[in-house]
Regions:
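...captures the hydrophobic TM-helix bundle architecture rather than a specific catalytic motif
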Residues: 1-521, 529-564
Length: 564
């Protein structure tokens, strides 16, 4: 079994082959270096099969009894979560490496890039198989540095500025992560995952923040909030998400790896510590708020960008917010399912970026005519079909999933919120009918609805199956949903309010499509225009952080002069 751990170290052979070979034969060495990457992928598949059939694998690299008071044992722990992440990492890396052999061939940093890509893969594999928080943090730090090196593959000023910004912001979030680890060890005396979870559950600790005012916080809440600070940085959560758009000057394959693998580290960290987060409803609520805010802001800023890479970057921020929100709802397995699907999709999109840009530059852009606008109007049939579907789709999903798929969707608030997002997404899909020439055809409407139903049910079935695979104990899954439950009045208000907004949106679209005048006060139009500019400029957070940094440097220089 210990041989399976070597899967994480095999990519180091690729780095050695590529970076130590003769420069004149770099393409041949690059192709040879693909073999260890493929071997690592095959080994990851074998590991997944072994872990699924025989259970988790624990490998200690030394005998703890032979060392006096070992604070941090060195070893690896591979369970189903680790094995799934290993397959995702090695699979995506295999495709990116093969693509990079030709794409990056004429780049001056060709060998350096391929070597760092292989080294990053090995570090990612070691991170997801770490046996304790200390080892996980060590590889987490190495990953941050390698991300800086990969983002700075091109030696020119914009790339350096983006890479430095990335390195700085990740250092701040990693400081919070380190604080959480130190606090966890001081409170519970261990950094091993299973003993840590057990001690946190059996021995609740309360910390006094301000004794004179009676301010207190649960120890597990303090630990999980600090560790979540590290996850916020890696997964580009608001307000420390600005490093991701600034790193867009890196090579396209680097973005494929970043958006498909590295940025998922936050979701993996929350899943690895799910039993710990399940003990703190306050932390889960905070995670939910941060994730929801990031998802909304990321999607909104994506719609205002005019650059394809920035659009994809903010799309990733929105998707990472959605993934973190799922963790905040207690749907940890769904977050893993989401990061896998998003990782595969975004890797494909980024690797196809160059081809899309090339075609866009060659194809003429025709102005939109009045005739086109008339054809895209919503017909009465299309609107009524979409509106009724918007109202009836949740009921149909509930009936079918309960009666046929036996998936309980009413037992927790988290699943209801996720159902609401499915509802909104389905409504958006129905709007695609407006882009069809046969927009008034009942056959087209029926085909769209049937396809939509099949997609929704397939998705729910796949998620339920994956949940049972990743967390076989139903009680554990239920405990996470109970811990993440919101106050009843707040939950009901959110559901009713968002439902009314969605329904009003349909009426607004119908009225505009039929030429009805909707009177909007002048101050509202001005506010919307200002809001558009605000989102287009990414909330001016880059400028705000830059001024804040200059202010801190100025204060530091003044203090230095006074003390010297």
């Amino acid at each position: 079994m210990s041989l399976l751990v070597l899967v994480a170290l095999v990519p180091l052979l690729t780095a050695f082959i590529v970076m130590t070979g003769d420069r004149k034969e770099q393409e041949r060495h690059a192709r040879t270096g693909l073999l260890p990457i493929v071997a690592s992928f095959l080994g990851s598949l074998a590991t997944l099969i072994v872990v699924t059939s025989e259970g988790p694998i624990t490998v200690q690299l030394y005998d703890p009894a032979a060392i006096s008071n070992p604070a941090v044992p060195v070893g690896f722990y591979i369970d189903r979560l680790s094995a799934v992440m290993m397959v995702l990492i090695t699979g995506v890396t295999t495709l990116i490496y093969r693509y990079s052999i030709g794409y990056m061939y004429q780049d001056r940093g060709y060998r350096r890039y391929l070597g760092m890509l292989a080294l990053t893969t090995s570090v990612l594999l070691c991170m997801v198989t770490s046996a304790n928080l200390a080892m996980l943090f060590l590889f987490w730090q190495m990953l941050s540095y390698l991300l800086f090196v990969l983002a700075h593959n091109h030696a020119h000023q914009p790339t350096l500025a983006g890479a430095t910004n990335t390195f700085t912001l990740l250092r701040l979030s990693d400081a919070a992560f380190l604080g959480g680890i130190v606090l966890a060890y001081s409170l519970y005396g261990t950094l091993e995952f299973q003993p840590l979870f057990a001690r946190a559950a059996e021995s609740p600790v309360t910390l006094a923040l301000w004794p004179s005012l009676g301010w207190e916080i649960d120890g597990v809440t303090a630990v999980t909030l600090l560790i979540f600070g590290g996850a916020m940085g890696k997964s580009a959560q608001f307000p420390i998400h600005t490093w991701l758009p600034r790193s867009l000057y890196a090579p396209t394959p680097v973005h494929a790896l970043l958006h498909a693998g590295i940025i998922n580290a936050g979701g993996f960290l929350l899943n690895r510590l799910a039993p710990l987060y399940g003990l703190s409803p306050a932390t889960l609520h905070t995670v939910f708020v941060i994730g929801t805010l990031t998802a909304i802001l990321g999607a909104t800023m994506m719609l205002t960008q005019n650059d394809i890479k920035k659009t994809l970057g903010f799309s990733t921020i929105g998707q990472m917010g959605y993934m973190i929100m799922e963790c905040g709802l207690g749907a940890f397995s769904l977050a893993v399912f989401h990061l896998i699907a998003h990782g595969l999709f975004k890797a494909t999109v980024f690797l196809n970026c160059g081809n899309v840009i090339h075609k866009a530059r060659q194809e003429p852009i025709f102005p939109r005519t009045d005739h086109d606008a008339e054809e895209s109007e919503l017909s009465t049939l299309t609107w009524s079909t979409g509106f009724l579907t918007t109202l009836l789709l949740p009921l149909v999903i509930l009936l079918v999933t309960h009666g046929v798929l036996h998936i309980p969707l009413l037992e927790s608030q988290g699943t209801l919120i996720l159902l609401f997002f499915i509802w909104v997404t389905s409504s958006q899909a129905i709007l695609s009918l407006t882009h069809l020439r046969a927009v008034a055809s009942w056959k087209v409407s029926a085909a769209m609805l049937v396809t939509l139903m099949l997609v929704v049910f397939t998705y729910l079935f796949a998620v339920e199956t994956f949940t049972h695979f990743l967390y076989p104990d139903p009680e554990e899954v239920a405990s996470y949903f109970r811990a993440a439950a919101l106050p009843r009045r707040l939950f009901d208000s959110l559901v009713v309010g968002t439902t009314l907004l969605t329904i009003l949106g349909w009426f607004y679209l119908y009225a505009r499509a039929h030429g009805r005048t909707i009177r909007i006060p002048g101050w509202v139009e001005t506010f919307l225009q200002q809001l558009y500019v605000l989102f287009m400029n990414r909330l001016y957070l880059d400028q705000l952080y830059l001024k804040g940094g200059r202010l801190l440097l100025s204060v530091a220089h003044r203090l230095e002069k006074r003390l010297s």
